[in-house]
Amino acid sequence: MATLMATVPRMVYSAHKLFVNNQVSLPRNFAMATDSAGRERAFKGTFDYNSTKYADVLMPHILHLYGSCATRHDFDIYAANASFEDPLMCARGVKQIKSAFYSLPKLFKESKIVEYSVKEYMVSPGNGEILIDNKQYYNFLGRNINMVSLIKLYLEDGKIVRHEDWWDRKPITNRETAKVPFLGRLAEMTRRGSMFATHVLMRFGKDPSV
C-alpha cells in the first residue's frame, strides 16, 4: 500500500500543464539496513515505491476531468468497457464517460479538485484499487459549492474499469445499498436516464474541437 498526499493550489494547472507538489508518506516499517559488504539495502515491507506510479499517471488526468479542461487523451486511462457512477449519473463505456465530464463546463462556471490524498491497494501490477479522498469546488450560477468526496478507481491491467464518486464519502444508492431494494432500483434507473439525456446533449461523447 502506498499513500500520496497533495494539495492543488489555485491557478496552478490548466488543460496543458499540471504542477502538483506531492508528498509520499512511508509506513513506519520502512527501514534501511546495511549488509556485511557495507552496501545499503531497503527492506520495503508493505511499501513498494513502484506502486505509486499508477497514481502518478492517473492523477493529472483525473484533475483535468474534474477541472473542466479534459481532452480526448485524458480518457485513455479507461478500459473500453469502463463505467463511471456518481449520485446523478451512471455511465457505461468510454463514450458515455466522456459525455459526463464534457458536460461539466456546460453546467459550472468553474470546477476543480482543490485538495486530495491517494491510497493504493494493488494485488498485482496494474490490478487493484485506488482511493482518492478529496475536496471539490464548483461555481454554479455565481454560487460557490464546496464538497468532500471519495473517488474509488478499480484497475485491471493498468486501466480503470470502474470509477465511482461517493459524495460526502457515502456509498451510491442502488439495489444493494438501499434499505428498500425497490428505491435502490429506482435510483439506478434515474441515473441511467440522466446519463442518456446528457449523452444525447453532448452529441454522444463527441470530442470537442481544439
Model segments located where?
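C-terminal and inter-domain tail/linker signature
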Residues: 2-210
